[in-house]
Amino acid sequence: MQTQSLNQTSYVFRTENLNVYYGSNLAVKNVTLDIPARQITAFIGPSGCGKSTILRCFNRTNDLIPGARVEGKLTYHGKDLYAKEVDPVAVRRRIGMVFQKPNPFPKSIYDNVAYGPRVLGMKVDLDEVVETSLKRAALWDEVKDKLKENGQSLSGGQQQRLCIARALAVQPDVILMDEPCSALDPISTRRIEELMKELVQDYTIIIVTHNLQQAGRVSDMTAFFSVELVGSNRVGELIEFDRTEVIFNSPTKQATRDYVEGRFG
């Protein structure tokens, strides 16, 4: 596993020897990396290497999985994300997540976006929040005349942008994306990628993707994870983390080169 200190001035997350267990089974081991602010970081690697597991550590959604536990150090703006006094719900407000399959609520488009601010009791103008969030998610022009329609009636690409708008409505600092385009057609995928490039001006974005071309197109930084057999268990580990152009053009690890050149994984 390679640990690199990258010359960035501001980090949102820093991990040190991070291990994730499911029950007694080690799922990912010894992950040490720094996630820079206002950049897009891509996690790539074969299935089962721990990309999504590590992503879920950043907003503590692993807490929702029975038997899951995290060891090691993970800080968010310099503060221990797993300290006893930290409220996981507050963490998830600041660190939003967009999942692989679009998952709009069975509510109107308006109520999907307004849901978070309502639940959190945010003292905001909901009409303004809904409009602003939908505009930021590049969806407003397509839905502004049908806000009362069910969000699940939208196309797959529109539903995913609605989920992004829903995440933006609670004013997050970070957006996590777990394979956000895997269920979408190429045109919808391109729109999501264009949207990411716009959003990174104001948000830190981390994306898990199996699509190497996508990682190369959208990300500033790339972390390559792989799998090691430990006894009968498959354990994920971070192999290399660097600027995306380095990972794809001149990686220092042979395993990284083999993966990005299509010889493995």
UniProtKB/Swiss-Prot annotation:
Positions annotated to bind ATP: G45, P46, S47, G48, C49, G50, K51, S52
Subcellular location: Cell inner membrane
GO biological process entries: phosphate ion transmembrane transport
Family: Belongs to the ABC transporter superfamily. Phosphate importer (TC 3.A.1.7) family.
Enzyme class label: translocase
Cellular component annotations (GO), alphabetically ordered: plasma membrane
NCBIfam families: 3a0107s01c2
UniProt membrane topology term: Peripheral membrane protein
Limits of the ABC transporter domain: 13-260
Gene3D superfamilies according to UniProt: P-loop containing nucleotide triphosphate hydrolases
Function: Part of the ABC transporter complex PstSACB involved in phosphate import. Responsible for energy coupling to the transport system.
InterPro entries given in the database record: AAA+_ATPase, ABC_transporter-like_ATP-bd, ABC_transporter-like_CS, P-loop_NTPase, PstB-like
E.C. no: 7.3.2.1
Protein name: Phosphate import ATP-binding protein PstB 2
Short name of one Pfam family: ABC_tran
